[in-house]
Amino acid sequence: MNILKNNNVKYIRIRAWVNKKEEKGKPLGGGNNNKETTIFLIERAKKLGFKVLLDFHYSDFWADPAKQNKPALWKDLTGTQLENKLYEYTKDMLLTLKEKNISPDMVQIGNELNGGMVWPNGKTWKQGEESIGGYEGFVGLLNAGIKAVKEITPTAKIMIHLADGGDNELYRRVFDQITAKKVDFDIIGLSFYPYWHGTF
C-alpha cells in the first residue's frame, strides 16, 4: 500500500467474501477475504490516508458474470429470508467498521452483476418453471444491501458494478431495469480488461 500511496493513488478497493473455507475448514485461497481479513486491510488503508471502496461479493469466493454462487451458509434461504440475511450481513460488517472508526467511503453492492447476484434467487432471468430470480429477485437483494448502507454509513457512496465495461447494450439493459425499479445508487462501476473486452 505504501507504493500506491507514494504514487498518488487515492482509493483502495477491498473485497469481502462471506465464509472463506471449505466444509472441512480449509481456506479457499484467493486472499481469504473473510470479515477479519477485510477489516485488517481496511484498517491498513485508512491509517495510510486512503479512501476505501468496500466490495461485497455476497459469495464465499469470486463472484463474476459466470458465477454468483450463494454463500454455503445461506443455501436454504429464499425470498424475504435471504434478503434479510444479506441485509444483516452487510449491516454487521458496516457496524464493526463504524465502531473502529474506519467506515468505507464507498460501498459496492455485489461484484460484476451482469446477470444478477446470489444465484439462483437474484439471477436476472428465470429458467423454465423456476419461480425465483428475475429482476424482482435481483432488485430485492440490491435494496437489502443498500438499506444497510443507508442506515449505518449514510454518507458512503453506493456503487452498482458490472463487468464488460465496453458493452453499451449490457449497461443499458441492466441499468434501465434497476433505475425503473427505483434502486437508489450513486455510481456505476465497471470492469474493463482489454484482453477480454476489446477496446472502446
Predicted regions and their residues:
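Substrate-binding cleft and catalytic face of glycoside hydrolase catalytic domains
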Residues: I3-G134, F138-K157, A163
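Aromatic- and acid-rich polysaccharide-binding/catalytic face
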Residues: D105, N111, A156, I160-D164, ...
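Conserved N-terminal glycine/acidic-rich loop preference
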Residues: L142, N168-Y171
